[in-house]
Amino acid sequence: MPIQVLPPQLANQIAAGEVVERPASVVKELVENSLDAGATRVDIDIERGGAKLIRIRDNGCGIKKEELALALARHATSKIASLDDLEAIISLGFRGEALASISSVSRLTLTSRTAEQAEAWQAYAEGRDMDVTVKPAAHPVGTTLEVLDLFYNTPARRKFMRTEKTEFNHIDEIIRRIALARFDVTLNLSHNGKLVRQYRAVAKDGQKERRLGAICGTPFLEQALAIEWQHGDLTLRGWVADPNHTTTALTEIQYCYVNGRMMRDRLINHAIRQACEDKLGADQQPAFVLYLEIDPHQVDVNVHPAKHEVRFHQSRLVHDFIYQGVLSVLQQQTETTLPLEDIAPAPRHVPENRIAAGRNHFAVPAEPTAAREPATPRYSGGASGGNGGRQSAGGWPHAQPGYQKQQGEVYRALLQTPTTSPAPEAVAPALDGHSQSFGRVLTIVCGDCALLEHAGTIQLLSLPVAERWLRQAQLTPGQSPVCAQPLLIPLRLKVSADEKAALQKAQSLLGELGIEFQSDAQHVTIRAVPLPLRQQNLQILIPELIGYLAQQTTFATVNIAQWIARNVQSEHPQWSMAQAISLLADVERLCPQLVKAPPGGLLQPVDLHSAMNALKHE
């Protein structure tokens, strides 16, 4: 058979195979066109589940007479005009294929009128070449599309249509999703001449919740937790049901929208599931209605024929943003249920941990008190039995968020005890009203050292060494194991018999460090790592860690944490002032003992006296 150009109707029918799956697909495409036209009211009339009639009427801007024929042509659209528009799509439709595809498998009639026109015009396509006929009609401002006898000329497609009830249920679900996306639009759905759904337009938040209850049901509304989460160009809002009270019926409510477009995105669902997994059973699913707003340049919606999926340019950032947003709401819900007697009273003044950046001249001074308790963090230091091989002698004292009042006198006495450090000149003295600090960052030297000033002395601090100690503190478990962060894509590695035996022997300790894995005959699958390792190249780091464990005869969490801290790659090949200040603030908060007794290689005093004497003798 020679190569030939397909007739327009056949080409459109082929395209319809991707766009028009069932009557619900037609309703989705046509209602989205109405929304793009600025409609505030859309009436959907269905007969026999959409097989006989689908009528969509709106009060949008309408289509001009001279554009009606183009509206039924392939690749004709008013949504985009250039590649730049395609890379930043803000409309629901943009391909210009829907009307042409639908008209090729049905008897479609398009009637429209703009506000500038005195009369409406009607267009329909027919014949092998899909010739468009335009004639006058009576119609208010807006557009009406009638789709009769869907799949009448493609018997194979019509044979696969389900029962009238099933097809209408799919249409009903599409309208529910659209109603959740656009609270400002009135949607009326009728079936066989009977009004089935009526979603009135609302504007205020209280009215939005009533419409949410009408769509998703009262049980969901009663358990819904509101979300408002923002970071840069990312915004997450909506509702998620309390996982502690999620029932089987609620798990069917899973609606997510990206820039107002309904989505079934696996990345979004995984982030939400991960945030709720601690409170959900193995057979439970989270219930949510969430809206993600993102810069259109950072998302590609042209990756699925029906536009059900998107591709994010920074998928890890979006995943973690959604995860943190949902998790923060669930944590706030948990905190609000705590009994009041278990909550310690708030302090009168909380000193800022900002010595590295300099004193805040705009801070409100604390009220004078007779004796202020020092703001020294509490940390555990003694050995405890039954810790599964964890060593505390010579280990890392893990910082805690604060200390109880009954321990205040003990720590006050400890702070008054004279120090016996062999190198007192390397210890930074405490500052009034603040916890001990390395001092103020003056500048960055050679890209990886910070020049510090404190109490009239100048010191050089190695930023990579400080970062390594901070990583070790973050990786060393305290009273509870390090929080594990599940991987979006688990890492599967082949291991030898010795490596597998070492992993099984150290599995409990690795679990305390936030590293979770499963092993089979010759492979190990890493499923979770601690937060400091999320941005590392795990395909290199994890095999090296397994090799290190295979060479050890005994295991301790401190030694494993030290090895990981020394072998992770720094995120800052060249340090900036802001990064150095942030690092020192974290080190002072999590590793206060480094300020009291800096280890070798961290701090080096700069002798100003010899330099000043040399200048004076010039």
From Swiss-Prot:
Gene3D superfamilies: 3.30.230.10, Histidine kinase-like ATPase, C-terminal domain, MutL, C-terminal domain, dimerisation subdomain, MutL, C-terminal domain, regulatory subdomain
Keywords linked to the UniProt accession: DNA damage, DNA repair
Molecular-function annotations in GO: ATP binding; ATP hydrolysis activity; ATP-dependent DNA damage sensor activity; mismatched DNA binding
Top-rank lineage group of the source organism: Bacteria
Extent of Gly residues compositional bias: 382-392
Alphabetical list of SMART domains matching this protein: DNA_mis_repair, MutL_C
Record's compositionally biased regions (Low complexity): 367-381
GO biological process: mismatch repair
GO cellular component, one term: mismatch repair complex
Stretches for region Disordered: 367-402
CDD domains per UniProt: HATPase_MutL-MLH-PMS-like (cd16926), MutL_Trans_MutL (cd03482)
Biological role stated in the UniProt entry: This protein is involved in the repair of mismatches in DNA. It is required for dam-dependent methyl-directed DNA mismatch repair. May act as a 'molecular matchmaker', a protein that promotes the formation of a stable complex between two or more DNA-binding proteins in an ATP-dependent manner without itself being part of a final effector complex.
HAMAP family xref list: DNA_mis_repair
Family per similarity comment: Belongs to the DNA mismatch repair MutL/HexB family.
Name by which UniProt lists this protein: DNA mismatch repair protein MutL
Natural source organism: Salmonella paratyphi B (strain ATCC BAA-1250 / SPB7)
Higher taxonomy: Bacteria, Pseudomonadati, Pseudomonadota, Gammaproteobacteria, Enterobacterales
Gene assigned in the entry: mutL
